[in-house]
Amino acid sequence: MWRWIRQQLGFDPPHQSDTRTIYVANRFPQNGLYTPQKFIDNRIISSKYTVWNFVPKNLFEQFRRVANFYFLIIFLVQLMIDTPTSPVTSGLPLFFVITVTAIKQGYEDWLRHNSDNEVNGAPVYVVRSGGLVKTRSKNIRVGDIVRIAKDEIFPADLVLLSSDRLDGSCHVTTASLDGETNLKTHVAVPETALLQTVANLDTLVAVIECQQPEADLYRFMGRMIITQQMEEIVRPLGPESLLLRGARLKNTKEIFGVAVYTGMETKMALNYKSKSQKRSAVEKSMNTFLIIYLVILISEAVISTILKYTWQAEEKWDEPWYNQKTEHQRNSSKILRFISDFLAFLVLYNFIIPISLYVTVEMQKFLGSFFIGWDLDLYHEESDQKAQVNTSDLNEELGQVEYVFTDKTGTLTENEMQFRECSINGMKYQEINGRLVPEGPTPDSSEGNLSYLSSLSHLNNLSHLTTSSSFRTSPENETELIKEHDLFFKAVSLCHTVQISNVQTDCTGDGPWQSNLAPSQLEYYASSPDEKALVEAAARIGIVFIGNSEETMEVKTLGKLERYKLLHILEFDSDRRRMSVIVQAPSGEKLLFAKGAESSILPKCIGGEIEKTRIHVDEFALKGLRTLCIAYRKFTSKEYEEIDKRIFEARTALQQREEKLAAVFQFIEKDLILLGATAVEDRLQDKVRETIEALRMAGIKVWVLTGDKHETAVSVSLSCGHFHRTMNILELINQKSDSECAEQLRQLARRITEDHVIQHGLVVDGTSLSLALREHEKLFMEVCRNCSAVLCCRMAPLQKAKVIRLIKISPEKPITLAVGDGANDVSMIQEAHVGIGIMGKEGRQAARNSDYAIARFKFLSKLLFVHGHFYYIRIATLVQYFFYKNVCFITPQFLYQFYCLFSQQTLYDSVYLTLYNICFTSLPILIYSLLEQHVDPHVLQNKPTLYRDISKNRLLSIKTFLYWTILGFSHAFIFFFGSYLLIGKDTSLLGNGQMFGNWTFGTLVFTVMVITVTVKMALETHFWTWINHLVTWGSIIFYFVFSLFYGGILWPFLGSQNMYFVFIQLLSSGSAWFAIILMVVTCLFLDIIKKVFDRHLHPTSTEKAQLTETNAGIKCLDSMCCFPEGEAACASVGRMLERVIGRCSPTHISRSWSASDPFYTNDRSILTLSTMDSSTC
């Protein structure tokens, strides 16, 4: 009973079966024991809140943040005990932070609600009661038969029942799911394919058994049990039968499908990506600083409490007559009184912890992330793709990268394959001037091969090979070549998953056949660019793939139409690294054609020119070409019957289907006869070499992680500049055992130590890497850390992630960045501190799972060197400045207790306590953190060495933290004691002889403080816009206007009128004005002097770069500023500003960028500054 109650409440959900049973059209059995399964409805819910739970749920989430919870505790303490400040002083800022965050999150959730309502309310047609019924998407139930028309989006995950084609096929595009723009073909089972009308579907009696929902877009296992004439027919269902929600129907008039997954159980919904939980180095530093300041806060409270009781213990200090304690108070527990006073001091000093820091940082990250998407330099016009920010929490981490791990294919290369060469039966052919011609024989070629080559001199007349879709059939003199290598070309034309589309008219006939079309009217689509390149090459030679259906593939060989019955497709997977098809030739012969990596095909071969082909494959790889080996096998009728039976059993299995299929595939793909190999070229992307060189100059180590073979990977690394010709290349490949691997690693470590070479490169393959990581991680890491570039080839996806994790947890704890474009790169993208997805041709899995997405690898340089640099500088200054201004704020409060005998009297008015962080000092730092550009973006991008100035979290080091903290304490001492010396003892500064009181003294300290911290922000600003001027000087003006207004009126709703006429009285004193100016100048003068001497004696590369940007009349030749002859009086001021700020207002600045500029050179050591045009002051 108790378990049932817990299940009903949702605490103990009932055990869920591994499979679900779906009755098509919801025709449930009328007799027998049947328990219907419960399925969710088809509503999509991306929102987090409802009207009823928004307030409690949002408050709970916000108070899980330590800082918010801390200030809540402070507020409750103020309510419970007698504290020196009003609860409003803590409650109002906390309320402001909570409210701003709640409004932001509420607005975002409201947008999600609107989006959900639009999707859930979309009209759909469902087959019910023998007719089509129009309803809304949210009303679709599991088991409903849904009709979808051309160009409509599937509202749920549907199993295809039929289409307007006789073979039951349809074309869809999944661009919105995985970004693949090619058309994919889905097929219905033969028994339902003929049910093309509502009336026919009404007679269908079928049950679908399939797996429970999972997020993998490409995985689906099930079976359909169809009852016809009291006989049950079982058909397997796979990914080719499933139409995913979010995909769009193309080139097909209409289809019918049965809903198997609905609502939040669809694959699209299960792939909704939650916000990244990665934490940046800045956030970790900020939390460390918070802990340090919390220790300072507790220390100040403890010291004040102890000193208070020490003073009270002295007999000469009697209680004042106005503060006499009652008998009950005197007899109360000293421990309780100590705790009460400690809490009161804690409340008094609590503003040293900046409550508004978190909300400011959150706003800065959110608003700042838009600049990446708006950057036209990161926009790729050809593909119409702009940079995307999937998480704004890591903006500043882009400025701290020390290691870049990159995929090769589609990331460094274009992933646009061009057929270049091939090896057929031990003979090489290459494309020269667009024609396929034979190369010379291999050294061990037989005489027969030589004579054969001499007899093929007519090959110069082969049809022209182009990269367009215009294919020409071969002339008659090519017949001999094609007949001689018939099986090779047939394998290329049949062993693939390429789809075909008529580019002139939609394919909406009874089948897929395009045999009546000219080859120029055909357009191929493929998820693999390699397959498309090979099929196009075969078509240009004269064997044209025309189309396919579920059971047939059609090929034109020299104009003659041939139809092959497609028996089975053995799909590609990353473990086997190959794919195969089993076809029945027109002669009735049953053949298997296999295609895959040389390491997966050659070990399975027992015949053919294996050694010659292996040599050719290595030669292709040395040229940087991608290679595939092609083989075949013939089956006898008995062998095929056994294979067909095993495949059917594996495909219809609901449990462990993938493992069973893998075992069957291994059984089938053996005893192959090698036909040859192909080589296609994948061109490097634009400016890849320059980008890698820039990363190296910035002090970033680049690792290439690829699945390609060793020779191909090394060749591409050399061509893209990852390896230099002068670099000492070390190799850790083909290791067979742990001991052999360990010995090789020790030899490499000795070579690195002994070789007097500046740079080393390391090549390691996947097998050797597994051995190295198993027992010798430390030795392997020692070798890697001493190499400038590392290339890992033959890598599996999980190996890529493991390598990155190994670097992440190394003693140096470097910041890592992974960049890739394919689904096999997702694991390493998620493992790295920062994941970059390339929006390439292998889908959008990488882009969807990344933190940032860009269209080209070359954009990485600006993303890191400009945006990363700016974001880090901005947020590092923001964090330090917040702690600095709060130290300035609270330290006078602490010092004041020594003069009021620790009576917990507050120095500032409660309104000032409340508004200091919210209104008076918040906007200048926020605008700075959004707009600051301490160096021109062109300089940062073209001088990558400047990136080193901010590496290793340098601006948030303990040294820098202590500087800002000490600066805050020193300024606070000047505020307090400067004001104290001004007022003095029994000194009258007013014309009527009155003296300043407690509130006037506190207001004077507060006024100097507001002006000083605001001007300090102005000194840190290098890039001035009208917005900076508005918020900087406007904040000071607002403070004065507010204080005059607040102190000039008696406010009836205030309990006390402490500030009435105080500010006006303060400003009426000339001495006060003089003191304010003197203290502000004194505070900032020390800071200015330090900046001047630092820039003069120890200028950083960034500070030198700042001096290349000239103000009117200033010519910057080196780290010293020189002025033209006849300098005017403003020169000294200009010199000082140039020393302090480094850059001037953009309204006066004059930049001169040209190809001869030093920032366009590759100088790695020194910065040579060019002469720039100057004008008189």
Curated annotation (Swiss-Prot):
Its main location: membrane. The active site is at residue 407. It comes from the Eukaryota. GO terms for molecular function: ATP binding; ATP hydrolysis activity; ATPase-coupled intramembrane lipid transporter activity; magnesium ion binding; monoatomic ion transmembrane transporter activity; phosphatidylserine floppase activity. Keywords: ATP-binding, Endoplasmic reticulum, Endosome, Golgi apparatus, Lipid transport, Magnesium, Membrane, Metal-binding, Nucleotide-binding, Phosphoprotein, Translocase, Transmembrane, Transmembrane helix, Transport. Residues 1-55, 105-289, 360-876, 931-960, 1021-1025, 1091-1177 are cytoplasmic. It catalyses: ATP + H2O + phospholipidSide 1 = ADP + phosphate + phospholipidSide 2; a 1,2-diacyl-sn-glycero-3-phospho-L-serine(out) + ATP + H2O = a 1,2-diacyl-sn-glycero-3-phospho-L-serine(in) + ADP + phosphate + H(+); a 1,2-diacyl-sn-glycero-3-phosphoethanolamine(out) + ATP + H2O = a 1,2-diacyl-sn-glycero-3-phosphoethanolamine(in) + ADP + phosphate + H(+). GO terms for cellular component: azurophil granule membrane; early endosome membrane; endoplasmic reticulum; Golgi apparatus; membrane; nuclear inner membrane; phospholipid-translocating ATPase complex; plasma membrane. Mg(2+) binds at residues 407, 409, 821, 825. The modification Phosphoserine is found at residue 1154. One of its GO terms (biological process) is phospholipid translocation. Residues 78-82, 312-341, 899-910, 983-997, 1048-1065 are extracellular. The ATPase activity is up-regulated by aminophospholipids PS and PE. Belongs to the cation transport ATPase (P-type) (TC 3.A.3) family. Type IV subfamily. Component of a P4-ATPase flippase complex which consists of a catalytic alpha subunit ATP11B and an accessory beta subunit TMEM30A. This is Phospholipid-transporting ATPase IF. It comes from Homo sapiens (Human). The gene is ATP11B.
